[in-house]
Amino acid sequence: AHPDCEPGDVFVTNDPYAGGSHLPDITVVTPVHDESAVLRFAVASRGHHADVGGVTPGSMPPFSTRLDEEGVVFEALQLVKAGVFDENRVRKTLDASVYPARNPEENLADLQAQVAANEKGVHLLGRLLERYGLDVVNAYMQHIQDNAAELTAQAIERLADGVHRFEDRLDDGTRVAVEIRVDGDSMEIDFSGTDPAVEGNLNAPRAVTIAAVLYVLRVLVGKPIPLNSGCLRPVRVRIPDDSLLSPARGHAVASGNVETSQRIVDVLLGALGLAAASQGTMNNLTFGNEDFAYYETLAGGAGATATKTGASGVHTHMTNSKCTDPEVLETRFPIRVRRFSLRHGSGGEGALRGGDGLVRELEFLEPMRFSIVSERRTTRPYGMRGGDPGAAGMNLLNGKALEHRVTAEVGPGDVLRVETPGGGGWGTPP
């Protein structure tokens, strides 16, 4: 998008149709030039912003049908030119949407922090180049990818040759299906049986689908190697256009990144017979009003494997976050944490048991709006090799059951309770 970039330039993007995930995940990219101003590398940082606009606080609307309902889109916007941060341009972009960002000051601070993080990366890369030289650094970058490709090929070779199929469904019935063809040290992953893109926001951009595949390959390797595209070299991935896993531009995608990604992992692990399903959702919770916005994901149970019971109360697979401590939550927001505990008995029984989910109970202390985007409320995390499925999750407001995705106004004294799913068990229960 910017082939004429110069030293001191920095760019920002969150476009789900150009390598992004969903709009709150904003990527800042700093080109790295040599002393002759030749572009050699790029350093990037991606951070989840608390709010980038959209129809609900937290930019995770349960019922969005268009991308513009989910917030502001940065399409490779120039953030810094010749070392000068362009605050006015960023402010205009944050305010230009039909549903503008609610706290642009926070966005600006986060973007400046990402620019600073990139600068640290550029500095460290510079030290590496000074010590070893460009040719050696380039060579070892290639070696890292070659090593990843070799280890992935070795891991694939340990799998049984042939065709492995699996499918699962989201709570609305949408099917995610995969066929994996293993041939020696290579494989083809084909999602052709997956349903078309949906009207809602469960569509997963192609980049999210590839990321889920890469994650499973990295798990398959089982060694502490840097995550990189070399893992994909022995693998061919087929994703049908205009499907749930590769929607056309303009489709809403907020839940695809956080929910459908989990189901992609579930079907891949199921096809390969590696693990029972983990909770299969991020249990996305947002709340706020005109003064603040808060977003968190809630942990649940992990699926059991052939050698281990599932862990309880943990974030699994695509989540990559932690639950906020009750003390921090109560100090910063008008919320009282009434309960935060394991959901005992929610893990699926088996020779090896699935992990238990969590119970998170919040009392609201002032008027606000909350939203929940969750899955595994009607479908249950599958067991493997005769193991029982984990318990489905539940969302309740003042004791009344809610749908798996909901947004509502609440007032002082209202209590929200989220019970997260357990993981599936492995093997026939004793």
Range-by-range predicted roles:
Residues 1-34, 39-188, 192-430:
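Glycine/proline-enriched, intrinsically flexible loops and inter-domain linkers
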